[in-house]
Amino acid sequence: GIAGYNDMMLSKSFYHLFADCNYILICQTDAWIFRDELEQWCDYGYDYVGAPWPKRKVYELPLIKQYLWLRRKLFGGEDRILRQDYFGKVGNGGLSLRKVTSAIAACEKYARRAEEFKLKQGIVYNEDWFWALVPKEFKYPPFDQALGFSFDSHPELCFKLAKGKLPFGCHGWYKRRNIAFW
């Protein structure tokens, strides 16, 4: 299940299996590739590339912004991850490109934090949130460039933000909330 998958994707031993490769492409069964651009994405040299998580306009409303700020102050500690933390980040893991040496180094450096993720449940502790939020030294593509790699959450908004251009691929295309778009 999801716990086993998260455990594997946060395991140094998993990435060591690919030590003779520069990158690995994670392409889950609910991902789709539209164009042959993998080599181009590898050439950019990023540590991690995944679909960006867009911040919808509703979160810019003053009352909502105030609520999110208060939520951070009341419930967020230094290591506490809240759902709002992923807004504007690059990181969905279902279709993602990962630099093997960087993943191995992060699994070593953040081993304690990875174990915390493995022990906790909930979407904010899925492995892709770890990769998007924990390794601060990782080189990620800017949000706008990541739109050219993949869409996952809110594909209609991503398509608009990408000025009507489809990405290299997508993830989660058959989810109920996404299927009408795809």
Placement of each model-derived feature along the sequence:
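Short beta-strand-to-loop acidic/aromatic patch adjacent to the donor-nucleotide binding site
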Residues: 21-34
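A short acidic, often aromatic-flanked loop/helix-cap motif at beta-alpha or helix-coil junctions
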Residues: 1-5, 56-57, 150-154
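Active-site-proximal specificity loops/subdomain of glycosyltransferases
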Residues: 1-22
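Short acidic (Asp/Glu) patches
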Residues: 7-12, 70-81
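Catalytic core and acceptor-binding pocket of nucleotide-sugar-dependent glycosyltransferases
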Residues: 77-182
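Conserved donor-nucleotide/metal-binding helix-loop-beta segment in metal-dependent transferases, i.e.
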Residues: 31-75
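Alpha-helical elements of Rossmann-like donor-binding domains used by nucleotide-donor carbohydrate transfer enzymes
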Residues: 13, 40, 48, 102, ...
